[in-house]
Amino acid sequence: AYTLPPLDYAYTALEPHIDAQTMEIHHTKHHQTYINNVNAALEGTSFANEPVEALLQKLDSLPENLRGPVRNNGGGHANHSLFWKVLTPNGGGEPKGALADAIKSDIGGLDTFKEAFTKAALTRFGSGWAWLSVTPEKKLVVESTGNQDSPLSTGNTPILGLDVWEHAYYLKYQNRRPEYIGAFFNVVNWDEVSRRYQEALA
């Protein structure tokens, strides 16, 4: 069964950009609920011991009765597990090395990336995510998904994600999603994103 991954920092650590109350509720309540639900759906099946990312990659071949729960709750678990890791206190700044080079060659540079990523997060109607992903051709792409859909299900590997469900920002930012997106760039853990980029290339 899946379990809630501990955070590498305190709930207060991302203040003032992401508030402690949001972090605690988001982690212990929302993420935990996705885990409880996907565990319940997979209990007693041969899929219960597989990494959730592997199930999302082969979503279309899963038994029909499991597709919905894995897509929604398994997606919620995988997406949030990535989200916590790509955040860090004293984050932000700029990516370095191979990732910086790829952002330049594939997307047009950091400013262009931030613009595209902000647009993806802003124009996602309703709930969903903005992503920086690696395609099967090993190219970087900015994309967005609805609800808890994962880029893994369409063959891409997400390396940076931003949750734009209202539960991720409403307590502090209410309807000011643009402000939340701007604040996110101050807590991005580019070292972790770079690590995930290298992993996706392997």
Swiss-Prot record:
PANTHER family on file: 37S RIBOSOMAL PROTEIN S26, MITOCHONDRIAL, SMALL RIBOSOMAL SUBUNIT PROTEIN MS42
Protein name as annotated: Superoxide dismutase [Mn/Fe]
UniProt EC number: 1.15.1.1
Gene label: sodB
Entry keyword Oxidoreductase: yes
Binding site for Mn(2+): H26, H80, D163, H167
Function: Destroys superoxide anion radicals which are normally produced within the cells and which are toxic to biological systems. Catalyzes the dismutation of superoxide anion radicals into O2 and H2O2 by successive reduction and oxidation of the transition metal ion at the active site.
Listed InterPro entries: Mn/Fe_SOD, Mn/Fe_SOD_BS, Mn/Fe_SOD_C, Mn/Fe_SOD_N, Mn/Fe_SOD_N_sf, SOD_C_sf
Catalysed reactions, semicolon-separated: 2 superoxide + 2 H(+) = H2O2 + O2
Superkingdom of origin organism: Bacteria
Cofactor section: Mn(2+); Fe(3+)
GO cellular component: cytoplasm
Family, as annotated: Belongs to the iron/manganese superoxide dismutase family.
Alphabetical UniProt keywords: Iron, Manganese, Metal-binding, Oxidoreductase
Stored Pfam families: Sod_Fe_C, Sod_Fe_N
Broadest EC class assigned to this enzyme: oxidoreductase
Cofactor note: Binds 1 Mn(2+) or Fe(3+) ion per subunit.
Positions annotated to bind Fe(3+): H26, H80, D163, H167
GO function term, MF aspect, one: superoxide dismutase activity
Complex formation: Homodimer.
